[in-house]
Amino acid sequence: MKVSIITSCYNREKTIRGAVESVLAQDYPDIEYIIVDGASKDHSVEIIKDTIAGHEDKVKFISEPDHGMYEAINKGIRMATGDVIALCHSDDFMYAKDTVSHVVKKMEETDCDFLYADGIFVNEQNTSKVVRKWIGGKFARWKVRCGWLPLHPTCYIKRDVMMKCGLYDESYKIAADTNLLVNYLYNCHLKVAYLPEFVTRMRMGGMSTDASKRKKMWNEDIRVYTGYGFKPVTLTKLMKMAWKVPQFIKAKFM
């Protein structure tokens, strides 16, 4: 099973090296790594080129202007030749060197279309400090209707499923992942598996955790849930927020 991992990047010189190194360090042998940079104006491109030196046989790298993260990810998906698509955002890094190996083992055992797992949010400056602990839990379709979704960077999805069910809607600036996940998990009736292991470390302060973006996220989430006919739509959004509360409590005991 070939896995294509996509990293989108724009002006992330402080964090991109860690993200790239964490993917290149994976012990799973059949990984295609795709890095899509949006013509960064800082030193991101130089750092990427330096980090991937010697790994050109497994890395595809492009740098060109785009209209945001979701366009970049869609470019990467269209470039991908793997059986499975996964993401490692430029602010994040893989949890361990054997993460992909564990994911593939579970996907092969379950013959699933869509796998999700657990993840942790860490302090932006001190990545050893855990801020939130995201435990995905067992999948149930009704939970999606009640605002639950898996943590986006923990998702590993069959590429043929993505091409059939649709890629990221680029009209969204923040909630295209919410839209895609609701579509896949509520509408597409996929075979879903849950891996009860941490697979990613995410820095707080990313696009979906930045307080300055929360109003826009609220509006975009309402648009998503309205589009799928979830009523009352505001209650669904509030329940989505409520699912996050236990994560902060669990983090205190890590």
What do the PLM-derived regions correspond to, one by one?
Residues 226-254:
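Membrane-proximal basic amphipathic "stem/tether" segments
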Residues 1-213, 253:
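Nucleotide-sugar donor-binding/catalytic module of glycosyltransferases
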